[in-house]
Amino acid sequence: MKTVETLNEGLKREYRVTITAKDIDARVDEEVKSIAPTVRMPGFRPGKVPPNLIRKMHGAALSADALNKAIDAGVRDLMAKEKLRPALQPAVTLADGYEAGKDAELTVALEVLPEIETPSIDGLKLERLTVPADDKAVMAKIEEFAAQMKRFEEAPKTRKAATGDQVIIDFAGSVDGTPFDGGTGEDMAVEIGSGQLIPGFEDQLVGVKAGDEKTLKVTFPEDYPVETLKGKLAEFAVTVKEVKVPAATKIDDEFAKSLGLESLDKLKELMKDQVEQELNGLTRTHMKRKLLDQLAAAHDFEVPPTMVEAEFNQIWQQLEHEASHEEDPEAAKAELENDREEYRAIAVRRVRLGLLLSEIGQAHGVQVSQQEMQRLIMQAAQQYRPEDRQRFVEYVQQDALAAAQLRAPLYEDKVVDFLFEKAEITDRETTREELEAAIEADDDSGHVHGPGCGHDHDEKPAKKAAAKKPATKKEAVKDEAKAEEAPAKKAPAKKAEPKAEAKPAAAKKAAPAKAAAEEKAEPAKKAPAKKAAAKK
């Protein structure tokens, strides 16, 4: 194999690689030997077909396999010989006009990771803001949980439905006067203001009463799962059968027993544990952001453009998705476009921090153990259908990129924990409101993207405020526990999407509210309005 460097500019590298016909032909011979025992041909005993006849029968396929293996080996040898650390998968191009029996000319283009001097971890100073899980906080959590379990009771026939009420409806939908599959339903319960249905559907139910018939006009979102309905104007003929109002929930022993607990005291114990975990998550988020700020301020180096572009695309797709669900999607997208470069700067910061954390972790022997990795895989597999879980496990075990995507958030957290141990930490007790305000002031997202990340985590930049433009762009508060559970997006046999019925209930928001038991490390929902961007 011959290699010639044709480009060395910044972090960009390009090579011309020649794989000789002799090397490729030797690999064809290896392929012939490997399949010979299984080849069957009339007139020959099993496994005794001459190699020249095997070549004649399977020549094209054998040559293609041999060429692919030669290319893979050639790229690996190039990486080892030149001591290259690719930022992403190299782009390999076979020259036009290649013919079997001739040398193969390749172009290998890539971006390499920058050479980073191992960051010093001396002198790190952090403040740890702590909030006690007092009785007031515990009761607030119980009340929040009770609100999520709210029930409704029948209202007088004359009551006009208001936001927060529940209406029971029959509906029949049509587009251009033609009914569509899944567009009809009976006795569907709709909570007005819940935001669970197609934008505009619930709002038009305000003021209806039992017995009313009304035609609702809505537009299906552009990202609606039914291809034929995306962006379509639809009409729903609705019959209101009943209006219900929220029933008061009394928090007492009986309420606790309805949840399968012995008493209200037991419920308080359970909720206190959850509040403590949630507050600990907020404390860690704040500390992590302050740590990342210190690292970012102390280091400035070139980062691979392809990594930045991948990260930027991740951010941008999420923001466009969120903008499409605003009251005025076009205005939201136009405003978003004005801030494109600020979001690109966010992507640069995230990538740089990811590289720094990776360098620190490698320099200090931070590792994700086999047992930890196995737990991650099994946790991620639970998000798939039972019959697909084993296929997912096998896929992650065989695909290095998928495994890296799964490992990255945990590895990052372990590096952060290592730095916490090395830092000088001072504790200060505060209130939840002050802690949330401190997080919001930083508005720095908890996950950064390094070379092993794969840039495919379920991290959401903060939704941009619809009415006014914020003064600064920073990162969203992130549920750190969620990132550890995000499966690699390239995994096969993904859990089947529920059949995209076209009834209004099918247009639910992408991120439904979690149950109280799943909110352990999630920042409070009542935090001040988030800023538009996610800085890292």
Swiss-Prot record:
HAMAP family: Trigger_factor_Tig (MF_00303). Residues 503-515 have a biased composition (Low complexity). Consists of 3 domains; the N-terminus binds the ribosome, the middle domain has PPIase activity, while the C-terminus has intrinsic chaperone activity on its own. Residues 164-249 form the PPIase FKBP-type domain. It comes from Sphingopyxis alaskensis (strain DSM 13593 / LMG 18877 / RB2256). Transmembrane segments: none annotated. Belongs to the FKBP-type PPIase family. Tig subfamily. It catalyses: [protein]-peptidylproline (omega=180) = [protein]-peptidylproline (omega=0). It is found in: Cytoplasm. Residues 439-536 are annotated as: Disordered. It comes from the Bacteria. One of its GO terms (cellular component) is cytoplasm. Keywords: Cell cycle, Cell division, Chaperone, Cytoplasm, Isomerase, Rotamase. One of its GO terms (biological process) is cell division. Involved in protein export. Acts as a chaperone by maintaining the newly synthesized protein in an open conformation. Functions as a peptidyl-prolyl cis-trans isomerase. PANTHER family: TRIGGER FACTOR CHAPERONE AND PEPTIDYL-PROLYL CIS/TRANS ISOMERASE (PTHR30560), TRIGGER FACTOR-LIKE PROTEIN TIG, CHLOROPLASTIC (PTHR30560:SF3). GO terms for molecular function: peptidyl-prolyl cis-trans isomerase activity; protein folding chaperone; ribosome binding. Its EC number is 5.2.1.8. This is Trigger factor. Residues 527-536 have a biased composition (Basic residues). It is an enzyme of class 5 (isomerase). Residues 472-502, 516-525 have a biased composition (Basic and acidic residues).
